[in-house]
């Protein structure tokens, strides 16, 4: 999942034109919003994709764009976000980052990947984030445990059967 978050955030960030960050309607902004919606719609485990613009080095940011699968959770451009408690989000201005643990915020617990949106000179102008819900991660972990238990059970039965045959 972490590799997928990294790949999604990096590829989407690279596709965003710096002009799209401006909240005024423009073709670049329309392309960015369409890209977020298309990728989000095509990736069922993704719950949110957003673009944040750093306002200062202390973690204050604002939303430039937001796509959210959850009804009523989409955030309007210009809405403030305090990233001071999310160090990897703040570090994403220097390069792609993926959370190692689930982080909870006002929208719930998620695992997130971040990548910088850069201008023509390579300067970061925004950060693109991709979130996967913690419930998705928990479901995948439960499935992995179920599969491991099933394999262990099959292996144990085979060992018992082999032991019975060899013991005769």
Residue map of PLM features:
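Juxtamembrane alpha-helical signal-transduction segment immediately C-terminal to a transmembrane helix
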Residues: 1, 140, 144, 163-168
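Short N-terminal helix-loop-first-beta-strand/juxtamembrane motif that initiates sensory/input modules
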Residues: 38-62
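Extracytoplasmic/periplasmic sensor domains and loops in membrane signaling proteins
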Residues: 66-104
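A short beta-strand signature within small-molecule sensing/ligand-binding domains used
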Residues: 97-98, 107-116
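Short, hydrophobic beta-strand elements of compact beta-sandwich sensory domains
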Residues: 113-138
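Membrane-interface helix-start motif
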Residues: 133-152
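Cytosolic-side ends of inner-membrane transmembrane helices, especially those
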Residues: 151, 155-168
